[in-house]
Amino acid sequence: MPAAADTEEEQPMLPLPGAPSSSWAQFCQRFRALFSGADPRVCVAFWLFGLINNVLYVVILSAALDLVGPSVPKGVVLLADVIPSFATKLIAPYFIHMVPYPVRIIIFVFLSAAGMLLVALSPPYTDGGTIATKLAGIVLASLSSGGGELSFVGLTHFYGPFSLAAWGSGTGAAGLVGAGAYALATTSLGLSVKATLLASSCLPAVMVVSFFMVLPRSPLQPISAAYAGYRAVEEREELAEEREFMEGDRDATFDEQERLLGASVLSDQSKKAGWQRFKRDLKRVRGLFFPFMLPLLLVYVAEYTINQGVSPTLLFPLDESPFAHFRAFYPAYNAIYQVGVFISRSSTPFFRIHDLYLPSFLQILNLVLLTLQAVFNFIPSVYIIFIIIFWEGLLGGLVYVNTFAEIGDRVPKEDREFSLGATTVSDAAGICIAGFVSMVFEVWLCDWQVTHGRDYCRRI
C-alpha cells in the first residue's frame, strides 16, 4: 500500500484546492518535472537553429515591397523564397546523408550569407537595377533554409524530444523576431533597407557558434561514418559481410584478370545496393504520406492561402477599426498569426495532439469562413477576425510540431532520421501551392468586393 501511495504522488495532476502558496509550489514542482532530463545546451542550440534558419525567410518576405517595388507582384518574392526550398526538401533526403553534419552547417551558412549579401548589395529598382540579382540572392537563401530544415529536424532524432520542442519554438519565434526586427530597424531606428539586410547577412554565423560551440557532440559520434546514412543496423551488417566476402583473402591461383572481374562485380553490387536503397526510401515516403505528410500539407495550403490570398481583403471601415490606414490591417493580422504560431510550436512539452487531421480540417474551415467573410461581409467586428487569425496560427503551429513529434514516437528508430527530413517537404509544398492559388484568389476577391461597393482593397 505505501508503494502504491508513492506511485500516485509521482503522477502529474492539477494542484488541489488549498493555500495559494501550496498550490503554487506544487505547480512549480510539476512544471520543472516536465523538463526533467532536458539538456540546456541542446535546447539553446536547437532554439537558435530554428530561429536563425527561419528568420531570413521572414525578413525577405517583410522586405518584399522594398525589394521588388510596387509594380511587381509580391507573390514573385514568395515563390522565389519557397520553390528552391521545396525542391531541396524533395530531392535532398535521398543523398544528403552522405554529407556530414558539420559540412552541411558550413554550406548552409555560406549560402545564407551570400544570398543576403546579393539581395542587400544589388542596386534598388529605383536606381535602374533589376530584380534578377535580388531574386538570385533569395534563391540561395531559400536553398539554405530548405536544406537546414530537413537537416536540423533529422538531427533531433539524436537529441531527443526536447530538441524538437526547442526547434519548434525557435521557428515560431522567427516569425515574431524577423518581422518585428525589420519593422523596428527600418522605421523606429531609421536604418536603410540595405543596412538592415547587410546586418541580417551576419545572422547565419550564429548557427556555426550553436553547432560547434554550444551543441554537445557526443550523440553524433555513433554516426561519424556518414556513408552509412539512413541504413538500418541489420543492413549495415549485411553490407559489411558482403565487403568482407568480396575483399577477403583470395585464392593464390587468382590471376590479375580475375581480380579485376571481382572488383567489377563489387562495383556492380554497390550500384545495385544504391538503387535498392533509393527504392526502399521511396517506399518509406509512401508509408509517411497519409499519416504525416498529407495533414501537414493540408494545413499549410489552407494557412498560407488565408495569409497571402484572403487576409489582404479582410478590411473594415476605418472608423470601425483601431487603424488609421487600410494598409495597417495586413501587418496586424500577420503579427497576431505569428503569436499563435509561436505559442503552439512551443507547446509540445505541455500539450500533445495525436490526431493530425482534426486541426488540418479545422484550418480548412477557417479558410472557408474567412473567404465567405471576404465575399459577404457578415462578421460585424474586426476583433472577431483577430481571434480567428490567432486560432489559425495556433492550428498551423500545432500540426507542424506534432507531426514531427508523432514521427519520433511512431516510426522505428532506424527509419526515423530519414522520415523526419523527408516529411519537411510537405510544408514547402503547401506554401508553393498556396502561393500560386493566392496570386489569383486575392485578385478575384478584391474585384468581387469592388463590384459590390467595397473598394477598401484598392485604397491600400
Swiss-Prot record:
It comes from the Eukaryota. It is found in: Vacuole membrane. It is a multi-pass membrane protein. GO terms for cellular component: fungal-type vacuole; vacuolar membrane; vacuole. Keywords: Amino-acid transport, Membrane, Transmembrane, Transmembrane helix, Transport, Vacuole. Disulfide bonds: none annotated. It holds the Pfam family CLN3. The keyword Membrane applies. The chain crosses the membrane at residues 42-62, 76-96, 105-125, 135-155, 164-184, 195-215, 287-307, 323-343, 356-376, 378-398, 428-448. GO terms for biological process: L-arginine transmembrane transport; lysine transport; regulation of intracellular pH. Belongs to the battenin family. Involved in vacuolar transport and vacuole pH homeostasis. Also required for cytokinesis. This is Protein btn1. The lineage of its organism: Eukaryota, Fungi, Dikarya, Ascomycota, Pezizomycotina.
